[in-house]
Each structure stands twice: as structure tokens, then as C-alpha cells.
A protein has these predicted regions:
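Long, low-complexity, intrinsically disordered terminal regions
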Residues: 1-260
């Protein structure tokens, strides 16, 4: 069964637990037309997309008072940071920023790429999720509405909703996936562990360690097991997926901890 058809016909599997959600825009002064078009798509006023409220059953209520405008396209971070830090965000409201970025996350210039990621970090520190929009893809693109379902699904997930889940019976299992990646700019190998607390694929958390931090990785896995057991009695099995064949030295801290 195609998940897209399921969400189109029946709506998302699980809505955001937040009862108060507010959107706000972050944009360059010259990108108001882009923001207006995105706004009209999100409200369902343009052909090709029914709007966020109808597609993911999430109320779309942009707060114009929180809108942030900046002038420097090359480095908007200082302007945005100043405005964000001077704002008083209601902690009882789940905020999501629609950032119309003048800088692509794949731009060759490293300093410009960092602007993209530092802004996301700044927002996350304020407990604000964000959805980035590339203005170059919006204005003159008559097919842009085909991108809206994916954007809407991403927004729902960032609001802690669940678009769909695996069609399998729920079991008391803890699944741990261990993967690796290399940061090409600094030449450092990292190991990451992603935890899924159910066999339905619902993601819970992610932690990252350097390649030689095998004991820290083991500790992370053991904490996940203990946290799971504390709220789920009768765990049936623990499944650990490794990205490679693990050496005895790497596996031993994990096995030793599980025995205790």
C-alpha cells in the first residue's frame, strides 16, 4: 500500500500532540512574493494542493507579529539572531518557522553553508522547528505544487505527528540502529546510534560519537535499554543493527553492560 495514498484519503496516522501551533515566516525583504505564494498554498487557495489544514489535519495559523525580515542575503544570521533573541515565545505554543532561505544548503561556499545550519541550530535552541523553502524553486515553477505533499509531511513530523507507520502488530521490542558517517570537511569519522522504541518504526532519539568512542556508544545503548524497560515491562527482545562487522573490542562493552 502506498503511504501517500493513505494519507491523501484518510489523513495522517497521528496528529501533532500540540494543541496550540503557530507558524511564522523568516525571509529577505525582497522575497515577500515567495512568502505570499507559500502562504496561499498552505491555506489551500492555489490549485494543486488542498492546504495544510486539510492535507495533514493541522491548523495553519501564521503569526504576522512574529515575522522576521532581513536585508543581508549573503549572511542573514546576525539580523535573524538579534530578532529571535529579542522575542518572547510563548512556551505553551509549538512554533514552526517557515524560512525562505537565500542560501542553498548545498552551496559550494563553506561559510554560506554554515549559515543554513547555524540558523537551524539557533531555532532548535528556542524549541522552534523549521521548514526551509528555496525561493528559486517557487516563483516561476508551475509544477511546485507537486512538492507540497512532501513539505506538509515533513512539517507534521517536525510537530511530532506521525504521517504513517508500518502495518505490523505492536510488540515489546527495542530496535537499535548503529550507523557511521565521515565529516568530509574536518575528516572525522563519527558513529551514530538511532533508537526506535517500537517495531513499528517510530523514531525516538539520535546520539552521535566519534569513531573511537566505543564505550560511550555502549553506554548510550544501555541507557536506551534501561529507559525502555522502566516504562515497558516484559521486553521480548533487543535487536541491534550494526553498520559493519564489529570487532570484539567494540562489542564487549555492550555485552558486558547488558549482562548487568
Amino acid at each position: 500500500y502506498v503511504p501517500y495514498l493513505g494519507i491523501t484519503q484518510n489523513g495522517p496516522y497521528e496528529l501533532s500532540p500540540s494543541t496550540r501551533i503557530q507558524f511564522f515566516f523568516i525571509l529577505h525583504e525582497d522575497d515577500r512574493e515567495v512568502a505570499a505564494k507559500i502562504h496561499n498554498y498552505f491555506t489551500g487557495k492555489l490549485n494543486g494542493f488542498r492546504g495544510l489544514s486539510r492535507f495533514i489535519n493541522t491548523p495553519y495559523q501564521p503569526n504576522r507579529e512574529l515575522a522576521i525580515y532581513f536585508k543581508n542575503r549573503e549572511n542573514p544570521l546576525p539580523e535573524i539572531s538579534e530578532q529571535i533573541n529579542n522575542m518572547d515565545f510563548d512556551t505553551d505554543v509549538q512554533h514552526l518557522a517557515i524560512y525562505i532561505s537565500p542560501i542553498s544548503k548545498s552551496v559550494p561556499d563553506k561559510s554560506q553553508r554554515l549559515v543554513y545550519f547555524k540558523l537551524k541550530e539557533l531555532l532548535l535552541k528556542k524549541s522552534i522547528s523549521s521548514q526551509v523553502i528555496d525561493p528559486e524553486k517557487v516563483i516561476d515553477n508551475k509544477q511546485y505544487h507537486f512538492s507540497l505533499p512532501n513539505i506538509a509531511i515533513a512539517i507534521l513530523a517536525k510537530l511530532n505527528g506521525t504521517p504513517w507507520r508500518l502495518d505490523t502488530k505492536l510488540k515489546n521490542e527495542l530496535i537499535v540502529g548503529v550507523g557511521a558517517f565521515k565529516h568530509t570537511e574536518v575528516g572525522v569519522q563519527y558513529i551514530g546510534s538511532a533508537f526506535s522504541f517500537t517495531n513499528t518504526g517510530k523514531f525516538n532519539r539520535f546520539e552521535c560519537f566519534q569513531k573511537d568512542q566505543t564505550k560511550e556508544l555502549a553506554g548510550s545503548i544501555l541507557r536506551a535499554v534501561k529507559d525502555y524497560v522502566n516504562v515497558n515491562s516484559g521486553i521480548r527482545r533487543l535487536i541491534i543493527h550494526f553498520y559493519k562487522e564489529m570487532s570484539r573490542e567494540e562489542v564487549e562493552p555492550i555485552e558486558r553492560g547488558l549482562k548487568h
